[in-house]
Amino acid sequence: MKKNKLSIKTIVAIGIGSAVFMILGRFGSLPTGIPNTNIETAYAFLALMALLYGPLAGFLIGFIGHALKDIVFFGSPWISWVFASGIVGLIIGFGARFIKINQGVFKLKQIFMFNLIQIIANGVAWFLVAPTLDILIYSEPANKVYLQGVIGGISNMVTVGVLGTILIANYAKTRIQKGSLRKEY
């Protein structure tokens, strides 16, 4: 019999992470002046959860959290952007193999790697996936959705780069580094 890949801990993290993402997405965002495009603090939290629980959990937290936010606060999900949020969590989650914050290490090398990964994740999601799906699914005008994608992507890169780095660095400080304890005589 094949072992289930999602532990109970990961499933609980997906549920709680989705709820926190939804709340941060609604109450922790600032308008940019571009219609339906905000500066979102939720993506800093998504980055932490994706690094802790991996790509599948990162995808599901971003996807479910964004879908819940849209349904609860706006009436229906905007599926192209919901999917893009999942893509951000997925790509950052793959970075967990390079950035092991559970080992208590988040120094300059890991900070650089994290920011490189999150810039790629946000670029793919907001410059490519979200606007392209907007055009394919909703027949939105290309100039509008690519402008929204660029503004949203850049603001998410900056938000995750600043808040995400601070959040992850502080989390890593709570973990004990391997070999850091010495026996006293």
UniProtKB/Swiss-Prot annotation:
Q: What is this protein called?
A: UPF0397 protein CPE1584
Q: Subcellular localization, per the record?
A: Cell membrane
Membrane topology (UniProt): Multi-pass membrane protein
Among Pfam families, the record links this protein to: ECF-ribofla_trS
Got a GO cellular component term for this one?
Answer: plasma membrane
NCBIfam families, alphabetized: PRK13661.1
**Transmembrane ranges?**
11-31, 44-64, 71-91, 111-131, 149-169
Annotated family: Belongs to the UPF0397 family.
Q: Which organism is this protein's natural source?
A: Clostridium perfringens (strain 13 / Type A)
Q: Which Gene3D superfamilies match?
A: 1.10.1760.20
